[in-house]
A protein has these predicted regions:
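Metal-dependent phosphohydrolase cores
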Residues: 1-258
Length: 258
């Protein structure tokens, strides 16, 4: 097994969350095809800071670990949870935040409903389908994964697909998606619609488990400062600027769109 930087990070997080050696190896077998992709690896370092100064890739790996632990515990201990598909829950975790561009300290202005917090689930599922099409061959599995990713922010709302411009950072990829996937994404956002938004939890237990894991990781481990919490509202994080200044870079991260 190659000891690349993503795997080394994964082992550190598995130890932090007290995953057994057996489960550490088992979970890695599930996520390895996703975690070793070049696009995932890119999101494990600067400039992809997700919450505070924690990288996006680090956040996703931690979400996958906590999702695995929650799903495994529920499946083992609850009689009515025996049908939980642990693999699907973990895959949702690995895909849920695969958005296109860093979102903190960028200079691009968008209308409120098209800001990062509302549209990033659509960007994430678009990238997941584009980069990992093998996970979406089965219509049933595709719907479970899509719905879980789209509604992982619950109880927060997301942008509904309603034929108005979403200002997606990966619009070209979205436009190239096969129509069947666009239809599934739209269906997922139409249910629970409130104006330009959609507000509901995932229909599927795997998505609900992942959504819970996401809150545990974000609120208990990712964000460790006032500036980090403030960035969730303002999109500007002074901690990133301080980190860059400490490393000799006096410029904030800028969004370099091609």
């Amino acid at each position: 097994m190659k000891e690349d930087k993503v795997y080394i990070k994964y082992k550190e997080f598995a130890k932090y969350y007290k995953l057994s050696n057996y489960d550490t190896k088992k979970l890695w077998r599930i996520i390895e095809p996703i975690a070793t992709h070049k696009e995932f690896s890119k999101r494990c370092s600067d400039p992809y800071f997700h919450h505070d100064i924690k990288s996006l890739g680090d956040h996703i790996l931690c979400d996958a670990i906590v999702t695995y632990k929650l799903a495994t515990k529920l499946k083992r201990n609850s009689q009515n949870m025996k049908d939980i598909n642990i693999d699907n829950a973990v895959v949702i975790a690995m895909f849920h935040d695969l958005y296109e561009l860093p979102w903190q300290n960028i200079g691009v202005k968008k209308i409120m409903r098209n800001k990062h917090g509302f549209v990033h689930p659509i960007e994430a599922i678009t990238n997941a389908i584009t980069w990992y099409p093998e996970y979406f061959k089965s219509k049933e599995r595709a719907m479970i994964i899509i719905d879980g990713v789209i509604h992982h922010m619950f109880p927060l709302a997301l942008r509904r697909i309603d034929n108005t411009d979403m200002e997606l950072n990966n619009k070209e990829k979205y436009d190239k998606l096969p129509q069947k996937y666009k239809d599934m994404i739209k269906l997922s956002t139409d249910i629970g619609k409130i104006g330009h938004y959609s507000l509901r939890k995932s229909f599927f237990i795997e998505g609900r488990i992942m959504s819970r894991a996401d809150k545990i990781v974000a609120l208990k481990k990712d964000i460790g400062s006032f500036n980090g919490y403030l960035a969730l509202i303002s999109g500007k994080n002074k901690n990133i600027k301080k980190k860059h200044n400490k490393n000799g870079d006096k410029n904030e991260i800028r969004n370099k769109q091609s």
